[in-house]
Amino acid sequence: MDVIQPRVFNDPIHGSVELPPLLVKIIDTPQFQRLRNIKQLGGNSYVYPGANHTRFEHSIGVAYLAGELVKALRERQPELKITERDVLCVQIAGLCHDLGHGPFSHLYDGMFIPQMQRRRKDQDSSWKHETASVKMFDHMVKENKLDEEMKKDQEFNKELNSPDISDDMLKEKIKKDLEFIKDLINPEISDEEKKAFTGRGEDKSFLYDIVANKRNGIDVDKWDYFARDCHYLGMKNSFDYRRLILSARVCEWKGRNEICFRDKELFNLYDMFYTRFSLHRRAYQHKTGNIIERMITEAFVKANEYIQIKGSRGQTFNLLTAKDDMEAYTKLTDNVFEQILNDDNQNMREAKEILGKILKRNLYKCLGEFPSKRSEDEIKKIKAQVALPGGTKQDDFVVATSKLDYGKKEKDPIEEVRFYRKSDPNKAITLTREEVSYLLPGNFEERLIRIYRKRTNDQTVENDRQYFKKFKSIHNEFSGPQPAE
Protein backbone atom coordinates (compact mmCIF):
# COMPACT_ATOMS: atom_id res chain seq x y z
CA MET A 1 0.00 0.00 0.00
CA ASP A 2 1.23 3.50 -0.83
CA VAL A 3 2.45 5.65 2.03
CA ILE A 4 -0.37 7.98 3.07
CA GLN A 5 0.48 11.52 4.09
CA PRO A 6 -1.37 13.70 6.63
CA ARG A 7 -4.43 15.26 5.05
CA VAL A 8 -5.72 18.82 5.45
CA PHE A 9 -9.51 19.25 5.52
CA ASN A 10 -11.06 22.66 4.90
CA ASP A 11 -13.71 22.59 7.62
CA PRO A 12 -16.32 25.40 7.79
CA ILE A 13 -16.26 25.31 11.61
CA HIS A 14 -12.62 24.78 12.59
CA GLY A 15 -10.81 26.02 9.47
CA SER A 16 -7.87 24.02 8.09
CA VAL A 17 -7.80 20.73 9.98
CA GLU A 18 -4.81 18.40 9.57
CA LEU A 19 -5.27 14.75 10.52
CA PRO A 20 -2.44 12.18 10.69
CA PRO A 21 -2.04 9.31 8.18
CA LEU A 22 -3.58 6.64 10.43
CA LEU A 23 -6.82 8.63 10.72
CA VAL A 24 -6.80 9.23 6.95
CA LYS A 25 -6.65 5.45 6.43
CA ILE A 26 -9.72 5.06 8.65
CA ILE A 27 -11.57 7.83 6.81
CA ASP A 28 -10.91 6.09 3.49
CA THR A 29 -12.90 2.96 4.39
CA PRO A 30 -16.49 2.07 3.37
CA GLN A 31 -17.53 1.90 7.03
CA PHE A 32 -16.52 5.51 7.66
CA GLN A 33 -17.58 6.86 4.26
CA ARG A 34 -21.08 5.55 5.09
CA LEU A 35 -21.44 8.52 7.45
CA ARG A 36 -21.62 10.86 4.43
CA ASN A 37 -25.15 9.52 3.95
CA ILE A 38 -26.44 9.97 7.50
CA LYS A 39 -27.73 13.44 8.33
CA GLN A 40 -26.62 14.84 11.67
CA LEU A 41 -30.03 16.29 12.54
CA GLY A 42 -32.27 13.63 11.02
CA GLY A 43 -35.71 14.93 10.03
CA ASN A 44 -34.86 18.50 11.00
CA SER A 45 -33.35 18.93 7.54
CA TYR A 46 -36.98 19.20 6.35
CA VAL A 47 -37.50 22.17 8.70
CA TYR A 48 -34.19 24.05 8.55
CA PRO A 49 -32.99 24.34 4.91
CA GLY A 50 -29.30 24.50 5.89
CA ALA A 51 -29.34 21.52 8.27
CA ASN A 52 -28.07 18.99 5.74
CA HIS A 53 -24.70 18.36 7.35
CA THR A 54 -23.79 14.76 8.12
CA ARG A 55 -22.12 12.55 10.69
CA PHE A 56 -19.07 12.46 8.37
CA GLU A 57 -17.92 16.05 8.88
CA HIS A 58 -18.98 16.04 12.54
CA SER A 59 -16.76 13.01 13.20
CA ILE A 60 -13.77 14.72 11.57
CA GLY A 61 -14.44 17.76 13.78
CA VAL A 62 -14.55 15.63 16.93
CA ALA A 63 -11.26 13.92 16.01
CA TYR A 64 -9.65 17.33 15.54
CA LEU A 65 -10.94 18.75 18.86
CA ALA A 66 -9.96 15.57 20.72
CA GLY A 67 -6.42 16.08 19.46
CA GLU A 68 -6.42 19.78 20.38
CA LEU A 69 -7.51 19.08 23.97
CA VAL A 70 -5.20 16.15 24.69
CA LYS A 71 -2.21 17.94 23.11
CA ALA A 72 -2.93 21.04 25.21
CA LEU A 73 -2.92 18.91 28.37
CA ARG A 74 0.34 17.22 27.31
CA GLU A 75 2.06 20.55 26.69
CA ARG A 76 0.74 22.15 29.88
CA GLN A 77 1.45 19.17 32.16
CA PRO A 78 4.38 17.00 30.97
CA GLU A 79 4.15 15.08 34.24
CA LEU A 80 0.98 13.40 32.92
CA LYS A 81 3.23 11.44 30.52
CA ILE A 82 0.72 11.59 27.66
CA THR A 83 2.29 9.69 24.77
CA GLU A 84 1.81 10.06 21.02
CA ARG A 85 -0.05 6.73 21.11
CA ASP A 86 -2.44 8.21 23.69
CA VAL A 87 -3.06 11.21 21.44
CA LEU A 88 -3.74 9.08 18.37
CA CYS A 89 -6.00 6.66 20.27
CA VAL A 90 -8.11 9.54 21.59
CA GLN A 91 -8.30 11.05 18.10
CA ILE A 92 -9.31 7.71 16.56
CA ALA A 93 -12.05 7.34 19.19
CA GLY A 94 -13.31 10.83 18.33
CA LEU A 95 -13.29 9.95 14.65
CA CYS A 96 -15.15 6.66 15.15
CA HIS A 97 -17.55 7.52 17.98
CA ASP A 98 -20.59 7.77 15.65
CA LEU A 99 -19.93 4.80 13.35
CA GLY A 100 -22.98 3.05 14.82
CA HIS A 101 -25.63 5.62 13.91
CA GLY A 102 -28.50 4.39 11.74
CA PRO A 103 -30.68 6.21 9.19
CA PHE A 104 -31.50 9.79 10.22
CA SER A 105 -29.24 9.47 13.29
CA HIS A 106 -31.23 9.46 16.56
CA LEU A 107 -34.49 8.70 14.75
CA TYR A 108 -33.26 5.12 14.24
CA ASP A 109 -32.19 4.32 17.81
CA GLY A 110 -34.49 6.76 19.62
CA MET A 111 -37.79 6.20 17.77
CA PHE A 112 -37.75 3.38 15.21
CA ILE A 113 -36.11 0.64 17.31
CA PRO A 114 -38.19 1.34 20.48
CA GLN A 115 -41.39 1.34 18.41
CA MET A 116 -40.50 -1.97 16.76
CA GLN A 117 -39.65 -3.44 20.16
CA ARG A 118 -43.03 -2.37 21.57
CA ARG A 119 -44.81 -3.95 18.61
CA ARG A 120 -42.89 -7.18 19.14
CA LYS A 121 -43.15 -6.98 22.94
CA ASP A 122 -39.36 -7.13 23.02
CA GLN A 123 -38.11 -6.02 26.43
CA ASP A 124 -34.45 -5.78 25.41
CA SER A 125 -33.60 -2.07 25.38
CA SER A 126 -29.82 -2.52 25.54
CA TRP A 127 -29.13 -1.56 21.90
CA LYS A 128 -27.83 1.94 21.37
CA HIS A 129 -25.70 3.59 18.75
CA GLU A 130 -22.60 3.65 21.01
CA THR A 131 -22.56 -0.16 21.27
CA ALA A 132 -23.10 -0.35 17.50
CA SER A 133 -20.16 2.05 17.04
CA VAL A 134 -17.92 -0.40 18.88
CA LYS A 135 -19.18 -3.31 16.76
CA MET A 136 -18.72 -1.31 13.55
CA PHE A 137 -15.21 -0.31 14.69
CA ASP A 138 -14.31 -3.99 15.17
CA HIS A 139 -15.76 -4.79 11.74
CA MET A 140 -13.86 -1.91 10.13
CA VAL A 141 -10.54 -2.97 11.71
CA LYS A 142 -11.03 -6.56 10.53
CA GLU A 143 -12.22 -5.76 6.99
CA ASN A 144 -9.47 -3.20 6.33
CA LYS A 145 -6.66 -4.87 8.33
CA LEU A 146 -6.22 -1.66 10.31
CA ASP A 147 -4.32 -3.46 13.07
CA GLU A 148 -1.61 -4.16 10.48
CA GLU A 149 -1.67 -0.51 9.44
CA MET A 150 -1.19 0.47 13.09
CA LYS A 151 1.88 -1.76 13.28
CA LYS A 152 3.39 -0.07 10.21
CA ASP A 153 2.48 3.50 11.17
CA GLN A 154 5.70 5.27 12.20
CA GLU A 155 3.98 8.09 14.09
CA PHE A 156 1.88 5.61 16.06
CA ASN A 157 4.89 3.50 16.99
CA LYS A 158 7.64 6.12 17.37
CA GLU A 159 7.88 5.37 21.12
CA LEU A 160 8.28 1.65 20.42
CA ASN A 161 11.21 1.84 17.99
CA SER A 162 13.43 -0.40 20.06
CA PRO A 163 15.17 -3.68 19.22
CA ASP A 164 13.81 -5.02 22.52
CA ILE A 165 10.21 -4.85 21.23
CA SER A 166 9.29 -8.17 19.60
CA ASP A 167 6.52 -8.60 17.04
CA ASP A 168 4.38 -10.41 19.62
CA MET A 169 4.85 -7.58 22.13
CA LEU A 170 3.84 -5.05 19.47
CA LYS A 171 0.72 -7.07 18.62
CA GLU A 172 -0.23 -7.17 22.29
CA LYS A 173 0.22 -3.41 22.66
CA ILE A 174 -1.93 -2.76 19.59
CA LYS A 175 -4.60 -5.12 20.93
CA LYS A 176 -4.59 -3.10 24.16
CA ASP A 177 -4.81 0.15 22.18
CA LEU A 178 -7.83 -1.14 20.26
CA GLU A 179 -9.57 -1.98 23.55
CA PHE A 180 -8.68 1.48 24.82
CA ILE A 181 -10.24 3.12 21.75
CA LYS A 182 -13.45 1.12 22.20
CA ASP A 183 -13.62 2.09 25.87
CA LEU A 184 -13.24 5.74 24.85
CA ILE A 185 -16.10 5.40 22.34
CA ASN A 186 -18.46 3.79 24.84
CA PRO A 187 -17.29 4.49 28.41
CA GLU A 188 -20.43 3.14 30.10
CA ILE A 189 -18.65 2.18 33.27
CA SER A 190 -18.58 3.44 36.85
CA ASP A 191 -15.56 5.06 38.46
CA GLU A 192 -15.07 1.97 40.65
CA GLU A 193 -14.81 -0.20 37.56
CA LYS A 194 -12.26 2.07 35.84
CA LYS A 195 -9.54 -0.16 37.31
CA ALA A 196 -10.74 -2.95 35.03
CA PHE A 197 -10.00 -0.97 31.85
CA THR A 198 -7.47 -2.84 29.77
CA GLY A 199 -6.37 0.15 27.70
CA ARG A 200 -4.81 2.58 30.18
CA GLY A 201 -4.23 2.75 33.92
CA GLU A 202 -5.97 4.84 36.57
CA ASP A 203 -3.35 7.56 36.24
CA LYS A 204 -4.80 8.32 32.78
CA SER A 205 -8.46 8.03 33.74
CA PHE A 206 -9.02 11.61 32.51
CA LEU A 207 -8.54 10.42 28.92
CA TYR A 208 -11.87 8.57 29.14
CA ASP A 209 -13.71 11.89 29.58
CA ILE A 210 -12.49 13.60 26.41
CA VAL A 211 -14.68 12.06 23.67
CA ALA A 212 -17.77 10.89 25.59
CA ASN A 213 -17.93 12.24 29.13
CA LYS A 214 -20.59 10.31 31.06
CA ARG A 215 -19.62 12.02 34.31
CA ASN A 216 -20.54 15.65 33.61
CA GLY A 217 -21.19 15.88 29.87
CA ILE A 218 -18.26 18.18 29.03
CA ASP A 219 -16.67 16.55 25.98
CA VAL A 220 -15.41 17.38 22.51
CA ASP A 221 -18.37 15.62 20.87
CA LYS A 222 -20.67 18.34 22.23
CA TRP A 223 -18.18 21.11 21.48
CA ASP A 224 -18.25 20.18 17.82
CA TYR A 225 -21.95 19.59 17.36
CA PHE A 226 -22.92 22.76 19.27
CA ALA A 227 -20.75 24.85 16.94
CA ARG A 228 -21.60 22.87 13.79
CA ASP A 229 -25.35 22.59 14.39
CA CYS A 230 -25.67 26.28 15.30
CA HIS A 231 -23.80 27.19 12.11
CA TYR A 232 -26.05 25.15 9.82
CA LEU A 233 -29.24 25.99 11.71
CA GLY A 234 -28.47 29.71 11.44
CA MET A 235 -28.37 30.19 15.23
CA LYS A 236 -25.94 32.05 17.48
CA ASN A 237 -23.56 30.04 19.66
CA SER A 238 -22.34 31.95 22.72
CA PHE A 239 -20.27 29.04 24.05
CA ASP A 240 -16.50 29.26 23.42
CA TYR A 241 -14.77 25.86 23.62
CA ARG A 242 -11.37 27.45 22.88
CA ARG A 243 -11.34 29.17 26.29
CA LEU A 244 -12.00 25.84 27.98
CA ILE A 245 -9.10 24.19 26.14
CA LEU A 246 -6.81 27.03 27.26
CA SER A 247 -7.81 26.62 30.91
CA ALA A 248 -8.07 22.81 31.11
CA ARG A 249 -5.84 21.07 33.67
CA VAL A 250 -5.77 17.61 35.20
CA CYS A 251 -6.11 17.52 38.98
CA GLU A 252 -6.76 14.71 41.43
CA TRP A 253 -10.26 14.50 42.90
CA LYS A 254 -11.10 11.71 45.35
CA GLY A 255 -8.31 9.50 44.04
CA ARG A 256 -9.16 9.99 40.37
CA ASN A 257 -7.46 12.25 37.83
CA GLU A 258 -10.07 14.56 36.29
CA ILE A 259 -10.03 17.39 33.78
CA CYS A 260 -10.69 20.61 35.68
CA PHE A 261 -11.25 24.18 34.54
CA ARG A 262 -10.34 27.59 35.88
CA ASP A 263 -13.01 28.92 38.26
CA LYS A 264 -13.61 32.00 36.09
CA GLU A 265 -14.81 29.70 33.25
CA LEU A 266 -17.91 28.74 35.21
CA PHE A 267 -20.27 30.99 33.26
CA ASN A 268 -18.77 29.82 29.98
CA LEU A 269 -19.73 26.30 31.08
CA TYR A 270 -23.25 27.43 31.97
CA ASP A 271 -23.37 28.87 28.44
CA MET A 272 -22.44 25.41 27.18
CA PHE A 273 -25.22 23.66 29.09
CA TYR A 274 -27.71 26.39 28.18
CA THR A 275 -26.70 26.00 24.51
CA ARG A 276 -27.63 22.33 24.79
CA PHE A 277 -31.02 23.21 26.28
CA SER A 278 -31.61 25.93 23.69
CA LEU A 279 -30.74 23.68 20.75
CA HIS A 280 -33.16 21.05 22.02
CA ARG A 281 -35.89 23.66 22.59
CA ARG A 282 -35.48 25.46 19.27
CA ALA A 283 -34.27 22.71 16.92
CA TYR A 284 -33.82 19.12 18.11
CA GLN A 285 -37.30 19.07 19.70
CA HIS A 286 -38.91 21.44 17.18
CA LYS A 287 -42.63 20.65 16.92
CA THR A 288 -42.52 20.29 13.13
CA GLY A 289 -39.21 18.43 13.06
CA ASN A 290 -40.49 16.01 15.69
CA ILE A 291 -43.66 15.15 13.81
CA ILE A 292 -41.71 14.70 10.56
CA GLU A 293 -39.46 12.22 12.37
CA ARG A 294 -42.53 10.44 13.75
CA MET A 295 -43.95 10.21 10.23
CA ILE A 296 -40.65 8.84 8.88
CA THR A 297 -40.64 6.33 11.76
CA GLU A 298 -44.20 5.23 10.90
CA ALA A 299 -43.13 4.71 7.30
CA PHE A 300 -40.06 2.71 8.37
CA VAL A 301 -42.19 0.50 10.64
CA LYS A 302 -44.61 -0.24 7.80
CA ALA A 303 -41.79 -0.90 5.33
CA ASN A 304 -39.55 -2.87 7.70
CA GLU A 305 -40.35 -6.41 6.57
CA TYR A 306 -40.07 -5.51 2.88
CA ILE A 307 -36.62 -3.93 3.00
CA GLN A 308 -34.03 -6.52 2.00
CA ILE A 309 -30.36 -5.84 2.77
CA LYS A 310 -27.70 -8.40 1.94
CA GLY A 311 -25.29 -9.06 4.77
CA SER A 312 -22.65 -11.59 5.81
CA ARG A 313 -22.75 -15.19 4.62
CA GLY A 314 -25.36 -14.28 1.99
CA GLN A 315 -28.07 -13.64 4.59
CA THR A 316 -30.70 -10.93 4.11
CA PHE A 317 -31.75 -8.48 6.79
CA ASN A 318 -34.51 -5.90 7.16
CA LEU A 319 -34.48 -2.37 8.58
CA LEU A 320 -34.55 -3.65 12.16
CA THR A 321 -32.27 -6.68 11.97
CA ALA A 322 -29.57 -5.02 9.83
CA LYS A 323 -28.15 -3.49 13.02
CA ASP A 324 -27.12 -6.99 14.16
CA ASP A 325 -24.91 -7.63 11.13
CA MET A 326 -22.25 -5.03 10.40
CA GLU A 327 -21.90 -5.97 6.74
CA ALA A 328 -25.61 -5.27 6.24
CA TYR A 329 -25.54 -2.24 8.54
CA THR A 330 -22.78 -0.67 6.43
CA LYS A 331 -25.34 -0.50 3.60
CA LEU A 332 -28.12 1.04 5.73
CA THR A 333 -28.21 4.85 5.48
CA ASP A 334 -30.66 7.72 4.93
CA ASN A 335 -30.96 6.44 1.35
CA VAL A 336 -33.61 4.01 2.59
CA PHE A 337 -36.04 6.99 2.46
CA GLU A 338 -35.69 7.20 -1.34
CA GLN A 339 -35.65 3.42 -1.61
CA ILE A 340 -39.11 3.25 -0.02
CA LEU A 341 -40.38 6.26 -1.96
CA ASN A 342 -39.40 4.78 -5.32
CA ASP A 343 -40.34 1.15 -4.65
CA ASP A 344 -43.13 -0.33 -6.80
CA ASN A 345 -43.93 -3.10 -4.31
CA GLN A 346 -47.62 -2.82 -3.31
CA ASN A 347 -46.66 -3.79 0.24
CA MET A 348 -44.83 -0.44 0.44
CA ARG A 349 -47.92 1.60 -0.50
CA GLU A 350 -48.74 2.89 3.01
CA ALA A 351 -45.11 3.72 3.76
CA LYS A 352 -44.79 5.56 0.43
CA GLU A 353 -47.94 7.58 1.14
CA ILE A 354 -46.55 8.78 4.48
CA LEU A 355 -43.21 9.83 2.98
CA GLY A 356 -45.04 11.48 0.08
CA LYS A 357 -46.99 13.59 2.58
CA ILE A 358 -43.71 14.84 4.04
CA LEU A 359 -42.46 15.94 0.63
CA LYS A 360 -45.78 17.69 -0.08
CA ARG A 361 -45.75 19.29 3.38
CA ASN A 362 -49.03 17.58 4.23
CA LEU A 363 -47.94 17.06 7.83
CA TYR A 364 -49.81 16.07 10.95
CA LYS A 365 -51.12 19.28 12.51
CA CYS A 366 -49.92 20.40 15.95
CA LEU A 367 -53.01 21.30 18.01
CA GLY A 368 -50.97 22.77 20.87
CA GLU A 369 -48.42 22.09 23.60
CA PHE A 370 -48.08 22.56 27.35
CA PRO A 371 -45.54 21.70 30.10
CA SER A 372 -46.01 18.53 32.15
CA LYS A 373 -44.44 16.50 34.94
CA ARG A 374 -46.44 13.36 34.20
CA SER A 375 -44.77 10.04 33.34
CA GLU A 376 -45.19 8.29 29.99
CA ASP A 377 -47.56 5.71 31.55
CA GLU A 378 -49.69 8.45 33.11
CA ILE A 379 -49.92 10.26 29.77
CA LYS A 380 -51.15 7.04 28.10
CA LYS A 381 -53.86 6.68 30.77
CA ILE A 382 -54.90 10.30 30.28
CA LYS A 383 -55.19 9.79 26.53
CA ALA A 384 -57.46 6.78 27.09
CA GLN A 385 -59.81 8.93 29.23
CA VAL A 386 -60.29 11.72 26.69
CA ALA A 387 -63.65 11.52 24.88
CA LEU A 388 -63.07 11.39 21.14
CA PRO A 389 -64.83 13.83 18.79
CA GLY A 390 -67.44 12.25 16.52
CA GLY A 391 -66.08 10.26 13.62
CA THR A 392 -62.55 9.97 15.05
CA LYS A 393 -60.50 7.21 16.66
CA GLN A 394 -57.53 7.17 19.02
CA ASP A 395 -55.06 6.61 16.17
CA ASP A 396 -56.11 9.93 14.61
CA PHE A 397 -54.29 11.76 17.41
CA VAL A 398 -50.61 11.65 18.33
CA VAL A 399 -49.57 12.59 21.87
CA ALA A 400 -45.83 13.30 21.86
CA THR A 401 -43.60 14.14 24.81
CA SER A 402 -40.31 16.02 24.69
CA LYS A 403 -37.82 16.21 27.55
CA LEU A 404 -35.57 19.25 27.82
CA ASP A 405 -32.72 19.59 30.29
CA TYR A 406 -29.16 20.79 30.82
CA GLY A 407 -27.72 17.30 30.33
CA LYS A 408 -28.12 15.78 33.81
CA LYS A 409 -31.93 15.53 33.95
CA GLU A 410 -33.23 17.53 36.91
CA LYS A 411 -29.74 18.14 38.37
CA ASP A 412 -27.48 21.14 37.98
CA PRO A 413 -24.66 19.74 35.77
CA ILE A 414 -22.10 22.09 37.33
CA GLU A 415 -22.31 20.01 40.52
CA GLU A 416 -20.29 17.33 38.70
CA VAL A 417 -17.62 19.73 37.38
CA ARG A 418 -14.30 20.34 39.14
CA PHE A 419 -12.49 23.67 39.04
CA TYR A 420 -9.20 25.13 40.24
CA ARG A 421 -8.17 28.60 41.35
CA LYS A 422 -5.29 30.66 40.00
CA SER A 423 -3.69 30.65 43.46
CA ASP A 424 -3.61 26.82 43.61
CA PRO A 425 -3.79 25.29 40.10
CA ASN A 426 -3.18 21.73 41.31
CA LYS A 427 -6.09 21.56 43.75
CA ALA A 428 -9.50 20.49 42.41
CA ILE A 429 -12.50 22.25 43.97
CA THR A 430 -16.27 22.43 43.52
CA LEU A 431 -18.28 25.65 43.36
CA THR A 432 -21.57 26.00 45.22
CA ARG A 433 -24.63 27.83 43.91
CA GLU A 434 -24.12 30.51 46.56
CA GLU A 435 -20.63 31.19 45.21
CA VAL A 436 -21.93 31.47 41.67
CA SER A 437 -25.09 33.56 41.40
CA TYR A 438 -28.55 33.92 42.87
CA LEU A 439 -29.95 34.19 39.34
CA LEU A 440 -29.33 30.59 38.26
CA PRO A 441 -32.39 28.51 37.32
CA GLY A 442 -33.98 26.51 40.14
CA ASN A 443 -35.15 23.76 37.79
CA PHE A 444 -32.96 22.19 35.10
CA GLU A 445 -35.50 19.92 33.41
CA GLU A 446 -38.90 20.24 31.78
CA ARG A 447 -41.22 18.00 29.79
CA LEU A 448 -43.52 19.20 27.03
CA ILE A 449 -46.66 17.47 25.78
CA ARG A 450 -47.63 18.12 22.17
CA ILE A 451 -50.83 16.88 20.56
CA TYR A 452 -51.08 16.34 16.81
CA ARG A 453 -53.99 15.42 14.53
CA LYS A 454 -53.13 13.12 11.60
CA ARG A 455 -56.00 14.12 9.33
CA THR A 456 -57.30 17.65 9.60
CA ASN A 457 -59.32 20.08 7.50
CA ASP A 458 -61.55 23.14 7.94
CA GLN A 459 -64.43 20.96 9.18
CA THR A 460 -62.39 19.36 11.98
CA VAL A 461 -60.92 22.55 13.46
CA GLU A 462 -63.46 22.94 16.28
CA ASN A 463 -63.37 19.23 17.18
CA ASP A 464 -59.58 19.32 17.22
CA ARG A 465 -59.60 22.36 19.49
CA GLN A 466 -62.04 20.66 21.87
CA TYR A 467 -59.91 17.49 21.99
CA PHE A 468 -56.84 19.50 22.97
CA LYS A 469 -58.78 21.37 25.70
CA LYS A 470 -60.22 18.11 27.09
CA PHE A 471 -56.81 16.45 27.14
CA LYS A 472 -55.21 19.38 28.96
CA SER A 473 -58.11 19.57 31.45
CA ILE A 474 -57.95 15.84 32.29
CA HIS A 475 -54.15 16.09 32.50
CA ASN A 476 -54.39 18.88 35.07
CA GLU A 477 -57.04 17.01 37.12
CA PHE A 478 -55.48 13.56 36.79
CA SER A 479 -55.65 11.71 40.13
CA GLY A 480 -52.16 10.24 39.86
CA PRO A 481 -49.54 12.01 42.03
CA GLN A 482 -47.34 14.59 40.38
CA PRO A 483 -43.62 13.89 40.83
CA ALA A 484 -41.99 15.94 43.58
CA GLU A 485 -40.08 19.09 42.63
Region locations from a protein language model:
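Sequence-structural signature of the catalytic-core scaffold of metal-dependent phosphohydrolases
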Residues: 1-92, 100-370
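Terminal helices and disordered tails flanking the catalytic cores of nucleotide-processing hydrolases
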Residues: 283, 288, 297, 307-485
